């Protein structure tokens, strides 16, 4: 009888089913997450689950690297302490798969953007992030469609007119399939792009924008910088990016609007050979010839554009 009672007490202690470092991480994370501007419950209709708890649950999903909502549901049921830290009443049933799915579909992305902005301002105030050295890049986000399945051998799956039925908003894009600079390997995909501006010192994101996959990186760079500058000044910054951002407008605006500098590799596809005088001297953008013994390597990539 004592053994049965002992086993029951063990089952009641939810702390025994979650490692203490993980529990401490989520406890600290959610204590420092400001969701005060998000209504916790709807003003009318059924009360349902707390919006704050649902948001925290999806943060757990990303931190744990889950790609499926079903994995999140299983994790919360097996780690009730984490569910408690999210804000759920663990004495009652937790949200089902369909509750999470419906919340995600109806959730306004503007709320996430405001949460991120609030956290960035808090981290800046604490001296954890700053904008003196920033970098911008994009990453592909594949749509959940069979046309992205590598096992699909349909010849027309990446034709622009063959829009996936499962996702009418996604678009056809291309991304590099290798990190080697001397290897030109590309892959097509249906989906989106996530453009992220980061603090290169701390490695933490400062701003993000999601677009459809066909949008070129350089076309949204200035919008991202302007949006960031509106709440977190980027004056006197050093802007780091890859050759996809080697565009004259970016050099000019970073210099003129933010008094910053760009570190961007030369995109050879956007350059041309400089005009030469009969003596062989290159002519600069201001139509003046370089001296015979000048170091021609100082020519800015931006000045060699069409």
Task: Provide a role label for each language-model segment.
Residues 46-47, 183:
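Outer-membrane beta-barrel domain signature
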Residues 97-259, 263-267:
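Polybasic low-complexity intrinsically disordered regions
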